[in-house]
């Protein structure tokens, strides 16, 4: 980055930026300055890293990284595995998966890897059917749903799912990435189901 001892890292604010802020003083004791750049979405930190504006980023899981590389012709690599954030299915005024009404809207992230994770979670909970053998490695999209059981599945940018859920009608559901759920004041214990 700007100097041999400056490390510029892009991250989403919760929990990634918070974790980086926690280690900032420890790195300073070792002679390094940690420059944290906060992003609201999942695309810009990878673009900034690929363009050399960052030394690293911290926000994604390996399937998302692989999908980003394939879609953007980049060759970004994971330097380390740090933690895993659970994906949760949240209900607005819905106490359990069994209480979901026909015609309910279910909002899920639209990017390849997280759409796959969301759809597999919905299948796990019996809310949709997918083809035999559907898996995270090969990926699935809403086009692969063989039976939506009368639910309206809507895909949106991952960083907007929590906000749309918070403004949704009672009876709606959303599958929310762990970091965005935390930022919205939700925890995995609030979820109807987790992957």
Per-region residue spans from a language model:
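N-terminal segment of the mature folded domain
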Residues: 30-33, 40, 45-90
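Exported/periplasmic ABC-transporter solute-binding proteins
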Residues: 158-165, 172-195
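A conserved helix-loop-strand patch within extracytoplasmic ligand-binding domains
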Residues: 79-128
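Alpha-to-beta junction loops
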Residues: 50-60, 104, 127, 149-152, ...
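Ligand-binding "clamshell"
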Residues: 67-79, 94, 184-194
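Short, well-ordered beta-strand elements
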Residues: 3-14, 32-38, 105-106
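Short helix-initiation/N-cap motifs at beta->coil->alpha
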Residues: 36-47, 134-163
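Extracytoplasmic
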Residues: 4, 31, 74, 82-86, ...
């Amino acid at each position: 980055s700007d100097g041999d001892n400056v490390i510029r890292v892009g991250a989403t604010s919760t929990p990634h930026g918070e974790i980086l802020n926690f280690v900032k003083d420890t790195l300073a004791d070792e002679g390094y300055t940690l420059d944290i750049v906060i992003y609201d979405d999942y695309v810009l930190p990878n673009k900034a890293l690929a363009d050399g504006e960052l030394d690293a980023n911290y926000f994604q899981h390996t399937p998302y990284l692989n999908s980003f590389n394939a879609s953007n012709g980049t060759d970004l690599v994971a330097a380390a595995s740090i933690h895993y954030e659970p994906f949760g299915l949240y209900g607005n005024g819905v106490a359990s998966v069994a209480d979901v009404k026909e015609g309910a809207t279910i909002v899920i992230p639209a990017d390849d890897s997280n759409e796959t994770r969301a759809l597999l979670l919905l299948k796990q909970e019996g809310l949709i059917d997918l083809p035999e053998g559907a898996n995270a490695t090969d990926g699935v999209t809403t086009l692969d749903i063989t039976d939506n059981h009368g639910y309206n599945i809507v895909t949106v940018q991952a960083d907007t799912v929590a906000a749309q859920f918070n403004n949704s009608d009672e009876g709606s559901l959303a599958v929310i990435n762990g970091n965005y759920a935390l930022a919205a004041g939700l925890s995995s214990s609030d979820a109807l189901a987790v992957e």
